[in-house]
Amino acid sequence: MKSGNPVLRDSTFSNAQPGAAVMTLDGVVNKTGVLLLLCMASFCYAWYQPTVSMPLMMAGAIGGFVVALITCFVPRISPYTGPAYAILEGLLLGGLSAMMEAAYPYIAVQAAALTFGTLAIMLTLYKTRVIRVTEGLKTGIIAATAAIALLYFVGFILNMFGKGIPYIHSTGWIGIGFSLFVVGLAAFNLLLDFDFIENGILNGAPKHMEWYAGFSLLVTLVWLYLELLRLLSKLRGRD
Protein backbone atom coordinates (compact mmCIF):
# COMPACT_ATOMS: atom_id res chain seq x y z
CA MET A 1 0.00 0.00 0.00
CA LYS A 2 1.20 3.48 -0.84
CA SER A 3 -0.15 6.93 -0.17
CA GLY A 4 0.69 10.38 -1.43
CA ASN A 5 0.12 11.62 2.09
CA PRO A 6 3.56 11.33 3.73
CA VAL A 7 2.06 10.43 7.11
CA LEU A 8 0.55 7.23 5.64
CA ARG A 9 3.19 4.60 4.93
CA ASP A 10 3.25 0.84 4.33
CA SER A 11 4.91 0.20 7.70
CA THR A 12 2.32 2.18 9.63
CA PHE A 13 -0.26 -0.59 9.83
CA SER A 14 2.12 -3.49 10.46
CA ASN A 15 2.14 -3.44 14.26
CA ALA A 16 -1.18 -5.03 15.25
CA GLN A 17 -0.81 -7.67 17.98
CA PRO A 18 -2.87 -10.90 18.03
CA GLY A 19 -5.96 -10.50 20.22
CA ALA A 20 -5.58 -6.73 20.53
CA ALA A 21 -8.35 -4.24 19.71
CA VAL A 22 -8.24 -3.26 16.07
CA MET A 23 -9.04 -0.27 13.91
CA THR A 24 -12.66 0.10 12.73
CA LEU A 25 -14.40 2.44 10.32
CA ASP A 26 -16.65 3.82 13.07
CA GLY A 27 -13.58 4.47 15.18
CA VAL A 28 -11.84 6.36 12.38
CA VAL A 29 -14.95 8.47 11.73
CA ASN A 30 -15.33 9.28 15.43
CA LYS A 31 -11.68 10.18 15.94
CA THR A 32 -11.64 12.30 12.79
CA GLY A 33 -14.73 14.13 14.04
CA VAL A 34 -13.04 14.89 17.36
CA LEU A 35 -9.97 16.27 15.60
CA LEU A 36 -12.09 18.44 13.31
CA LEU A 37 -13.99 19.85 16.30
CA LEU A 38 -10.73 20.67 18.09
CA CYS A 39 -9.38 22.31 14.95
CA MET A 40 -12.54 24.37 14.52
CA ALA A 41 -12.50 25.42 18.19
CA SER A 42 -8.95 26.78 18.00
CA PHE A 43 -9.78 28.27 14.59
CA CYS A 44 -12.60 30.27 16.17
CA TYR A 45 -10.34 31.39 19.02
CA ALA A 46 -7.67 32.69 16.62
CA TRP A 47 -10.32 34.28 14.41
CA TYR A 48 -11.45 36.52 17.26
CA GLN A 49 -7.91 37.51 18.33
CA PRO A 50 -6.92 39.90 15.52
CA THR A 51 -4.33 41.73 17.61
CA VAL A 52 -2.25 38.57 18.01
CA SER A 53 -3.00 36.86 14.69
CA MET A 54 0.62 36.70 13.60
CA PRO A 55 2.00 35.12 16.83
CA LEU A 56 -0.83 32.58 16.81
CA MET A 57 -0.15 31.76 13.16
CA MET A 58 3.57 31.29 13.81
CA ALA A 59 2.91 29.10 16.85
CA GLY A 60 0.43 27.04 14.89
CA ALA A 61 2.65 26.67 11.82
CA ILE A 62 5.87 25.78 13.64
CA GLY A 63 4.21 23.76 16.39
CA GLY A 64 2.01 21.91 13.95
CA PHE A 65 4.96 21.01 11.74
CA VAL A 66 6.97 19.66 14.70
CA VAL A 67 4.03 17.68 16.10
CA ALA A 68 3.26 16.26 12.65
CA LEU A 69 6.84 15.03 12.25
CA ILE A 70 6.78 13.41 15.69
CA THR A 71 3.47 11.72 14.90
CA CYS A 72 4.80 10.39 11.59
CA PHE A 73 7.75 8.73 13.29
CA VAL A 74 5.85 7.53 16.39
CA PRO A 75 2.27 6.70 15.32
CA ARG A 76 1.44 4.99 18.63
CA ILE A 77 1.34 8.38 20.39
CA SER A 78 -1.17 9.77 17.88
CA PRO A 79 -4.00 9.69 20.49
CA TYR A 80 -2.09 12.57 22.13
CA THR A 81 -0.27 14.25 19.26
CA GLY A 82 -3.28 14.11 16.91
CA PRO A 83 -5.39 16.44 19.09
CA ALA A 84 -2.35 18.68 19.66
CA TYR A 85 -1.84 18.95 15.90
CA ALA A 86 -5.51 19.76 15.35
CA ILE A 87 -5.40 22.60 17.89
CA LEU A 88 -2.18 24.05 16.49
CA GLU A 89 -3.40 23.93 12.90
CA GLY A 90 -6.62 25.60 13.98
CA LEU A 91 -4.58 28.52 15.30
CA LEU A 92 -2.73 28.77 11.98
CA LEU A 93 -5.85 28.55 9.85
CA GLY A 94 -7.88 30.86 12.07
CA GLY A 95 -5.27 33.60 12.13
CA LEU A 96 -4.56 33.36 8.41
CA SER A 97 -8.25 33.24 7.49
CA ALA A 98 -9.01 36.31 9.60
CA MET A 99 -6.27 38.26 7.85
CA MET A 100 -7.49 37.21 4.40
CA GLU A 101 -11.10 37.87 5.37
CA ALA A 102 -10.21 41.52 5.96
CA ALA A 103 -9.11 41.79 2.34
CA TYR A 104 -11.65 39.41 0.78
CA PRO A 105 -14.94 39.19 2.72
CA TYR A 106 -16.45 35.69 3.05
CA ILE A 107 -13.36 34.01 1.62
CA ALA A 108 -13.02 31.74 4.68
CA VAL A 109 -16.60 30.49 4.39
CA GLN A 110 -16.11 29.86 0.69
CA ALA A 111 -12.87 27.95 1.24
CA ALA A 112 -14.38 25.86 4.05
CA ALA A 113 -17.47 25.01 1.98
CA LEU A 114 -15.31 24.00 -0.97
CA THR A 115 -13.04 21.91 1.27
CA PHE A 116 -15.84 19.84 2.76
CA GLY A 117 -17.65 19.73 -0.56
CA THR A 118 -14.52 18.32 -2.17
CA LEU A 119 -14.19 15.79 0.67
CA ALA A 120 -17.76 14.59 0.07
CA ILE A 121 -17.26 14.36 -3.69
CA MET A 122 -13.98 12.45 -3.46
CA LEU A 123 -15.41 10.06 -0.87
CA THR A 124 -18.37 9.38 -3.16
CA LEU A 125 -16.08 8.80 -6.13
CA TYR A 126 -13.99 6.42 -4.04
CA LYS A 127 -16.90 4.46 -2.55
CA THR A 128 -18.64 4.04 -5.91
CA ARG A 129 -15.32 3.12 -7.57
CA VAL A 130 -15.85 5.74 -10.25
CA ILE A 131 -12.15 6.41 -9.69
CA ARG A 132 -10.16 3.29 -8.85
CA VAL A 133 -6.99 3.74 -6.84
CA THR A 134 -4.60 1.71 -8.98
CA GLU A 135 -0.86 1.41 -8.48
CA GLY A 136 -0.34 3.65 -11.50
CA LEU A 137 -2.59 6.35 -10.05
CA LYS A 138 -0.83 6.12 -6.70
CA THR A 139 2.58 6.50 -8.32
CA GLY A 140 1.47 9.51 -10.35
CA ILE A 141 -0.05 11.31 -7.36
CA ILE A 142 2.94 10.57 -5.15
CA ALA A 143 5.34 11.90 -7.79
CA ALA A 144 3.27 15.04 -8.38
CA THR A 145 2.93 15.69 -4.65
CA ALA A 146 6.68 15.32 -4.15
CA ALA A 147 7.30 17.72 -7.04
CA ILE A 148 4.98 20.35 -5.54
CA ALA A 149 6.61 19.95 -2.13
CA LEU A 150 10.04 20.46 -3.70
CA LEU A 151 8.80 23.49 -5.63
CA TYR A 152 7.40 25.07 -2.46
CA PHE A 153 10.64 24.35 -0.61
CA VAL A 154 12.71 25.99 -3.35
CA GLY A 155 10.33 28.95 -3.32
CA PHE A 156 10.75 29.27 0.46
CA ILE A 157 14.54 29.31 0.14
CA LEU A 158 14.39 31.90 -2.65
CA ASN A 159 12.09 34.10 -0.57
CA MET A 160 14.74 34.19 2.14
CA PHE A 161 16.99 35.94 -0.38
CA GLY A 162 14.31 38.33 -1.60
CA LYS A 163 13.52 36.36 -4.72
CA GLY A 164 10.77 33.97 -5.74
CA ILE A 165 9.47 31.63 -8.41
CA PRO A 166 7.78 33.80 -11.07
CA TYR A 167 4.16 33.53 -12.17
CA ILE A 168 2.87 30.70 -9.97
CA HIS A 169 1.81 33.04 -7.15
CA SER A 170 0.47 35.76 -9.43
CA THR A 171 -3.18 36.54 -10.16
CA GLY A 172 -2.61 35.85 -13.86
CA TRP A 173 -3.83 32.76 -15.66
CA ILE A 174 -0.59 30.89 -15.01
CA GLY A 175 -0.91 31.48 -11.28
CA ILE A 176 -4.59 30.52 -11.26
CA GLY A 177 -3.90 27.43 -13.37
CA PHE A 178 -1.14 26.38 -11.00
CA SER A 179 -3.44 26.75 -7.99
CA LEU A 180 -6.18 24.76 -9.73
CA PHE A 181 -3.69 21.96 -10.36
CA VAL A 182 -2.52 21.90 -6.73
CA VAL A 183 -6.10 21.95 -5.43
CA GLY A 184 -6.87 18.98 -7.68
CA LEU A 185 -3.76 17.19 -6.48
CA ALA A 186 -4.73 17.72 -2.83
CA ALA A 187 -8.18 16.35 -3.62
CA PHE A 188 -6.70 13.23 -5.22
CA ASN A 189 -4.56 12.70 -2.15
CA LEU A 190 -7.83 12.18 -0.28
CA LEU A 191 -8.46 9.15 -2.50
CA LEU A 192 -5.13 7.69 -1.45
CA ASP A 193 -5.95 8.35 2.19
CA PHE A 194 -9.28 6.55 1.88
CA ASP A 195 -7.60 3.61 0.18
CA PHE A 196 -4.88 3.35 2.79
CA ILE A 197 -7.36 3.55 5.66
CA GLU A 198 -9.60 0.92 4.08
CA ASN A 199 -6.65 -1.43 3.74
CA GLY A 200 -5.57 -0.70 7.30
CA ILE A 201 -9.00 -1.75 8.56
CA LEU A 202 -8.95 -4.91 6.43
CA ASN A 203 -5.48 -5.79 7.73
CA GLY A 204 -6.49 -5.37 11.37
CA ALA A 205 -4.39 -2.33 12.28
CA PRO A 206 -4.08 -1.59 16.03
CA LYS A 207 -6.73 0.56 17.72
CA HIS A 208 -4.53 3.64 18.12
CA MET A 209 -4.34 3.86 14.35
CA GLU A 210 -7.86 5.31 14.37
CA TRP A 211 -6.33 8.50 15.77
CA TYR A 212 -3.48 8.30 13.29
CA ALA A 213 -5.90 7.89 10.40
CA GLY A 214 -7.88 10.92 11.57
CA PHE A 215 -4.66 12.90 11.88
CA SER A 216 -3.65 11.87 8.37
CA LEU A 217 -6.96 13.00 6.89
CA LEU A 218 -6.68 16.28 8.74
CA VAL A 219 -3.23 16.88 7.23
CA THR A 220 -4.70 16.57 3.75
CA LEU A 221 -7.75 18.70 4.57
CA VAL A 222 -5.56 21.47 6.00
CA TRP A 223 -3.48 21.44 2.82
CA LEU A 224 -6.63 21.51 0.66
CA TYR A 225 -8.11 24.42 2.64
CA LEU A 226 -4.90 26.44 2.37
CA GLU A 227 -4.69 25.87 -1.38
CA LEU A 228 -8.33 26.86 -1.81
CA LEU A 229 -7.68 30.05 0.14
CA ARG A 230 -4.78 30.76 -2.18
CA LEU A 231 -6.86 30.07 -5.30
CA LEU A 232 -9.82 32.17 -4.14
CA SER A 233 -7.55 35.09 -3.22
CA LYS A 234 -6.07 35.01 -6.72
CA LEU A 235 -9.51 34.99 -8.32
CA ARG A 236 -10.75 37.77 -6.05
CA GLY A 237 -7.55 39.72 -6.65
CA ARG A 238 -8.39 39.97 -10.34
CA ASP A 239 -11.55 42.00 -9.62
Pin down the residues of each PLM region.
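A hydrophobic alpha-helical transmembrane-helix feature that marks the membrane cores
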Residues: 1-239
